[in-house]
Structures are given as C-alpha cells and as structure tokens.
C-alpha cells in the first residue's frame, strides 16, 4: 500500500508548525509569571516591613499572615 506524498507533506508541515509554536517567547508564560511573582513578593515584603515599623501590635501579625502565602508561592515556584 502506497502512502501519498501529500500525506507526508501534511505530517511534516504540522510537525514543524507545532515545534515553531513552542519556540516562540509568547508560548512561554513562565518568564512572565516569574517576574510577576518576584514583583509580588517584593511588594509584600515592603508591606510587611512597613507594618512592622508601626507601633500597633496587631498589624505585624496580620501582615505576616497575609504575606507568608505569597512568599511561600514565590519560593516554591523558584526552587520547587
């Protein structure tokens, strides 16, 4: 049974288009997500530092409770 040349060409074209799609930087959201996670972690760390500098006792505890999940998410994403 002979396979038509058009089928070979179609398989090669589909394979190449798929590999080119993965090679584009738009298909890689990891760098964008990493930059966003880093910016979020830095902003939350600044918010925690500001809250710790204030004399009210409840705010540092509240700030730590809010910031810790973001720091955990950043560290797991970076080193996990």
From Swiss-Prot:
<comment type="function">
    <text>Vertebrate-selective toxin that causes pain by targeting voltage-gated sodium channels.</text>
</comment>
<feature type="signal peptide">
    <location>
        <begin position="1"/>
        <end position="23"/>
    </location>
</feature>
<keyword id="KW-0872">Ion channel impairing toxin</keyword>
<comment type="similarity">
    <text>Belongs to the formicidae venom clade 1 family.</text>
</comment>
<keyword id="KW-0964">Secreted</keyword>
<dbReference type="GO" id="GO:0090729">
    <property type="term" value="F:toxin activity"/>
</dbReference>
<keyword id="KW-0800">Toxin</keyword>
<feature type="modified residue" description="Phenylalanine amide">
    <location>
        <position position="79"/>
    </location>
</feature>
<keyword id="KW-0027">Amidation</keyword>
<dbReference type="GO" id="GO:0017080">
    <property type="term" value="F:sodium channel regulator activity"/>
</dbReference>
<feature type="propeptide">
    <location>
        <begin position="24"/>
        <end position="57"/>
    </location>
</feature>
<dbReference type="GO" id="GO:0005576">
    <property type="term" value="C:extracellular region"/>
</dbReference>
<keyword id="KW-0732">Signal</keyword>
<protein>
    <recommendedName>
        <fullName>Myrmicitoxin(1)-Pr1a</fullName>
    </recommendedName>
</protein>
<keyword id="KW-0738">Voltage-gated sodium channel impairing toxin</keyword>
């Amino acid at each position: 049974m002979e396979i038509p040349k058009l089928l070979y060409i179609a398989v090669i074209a589909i394979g190449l288009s798929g590999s080119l799609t993965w090679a584009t930087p738009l298909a890689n959201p990891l760098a964008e997500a990493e930059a966003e996670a880093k910016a979020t972690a830095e902003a939350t760390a600044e918010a925690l530092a500001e809250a710790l500098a204030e004399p009210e006792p409840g705010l540092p505890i509240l700030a730590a409770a809010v910031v810790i999940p973001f720091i955990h998410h950043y560290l797991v994403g970076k080193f996990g």
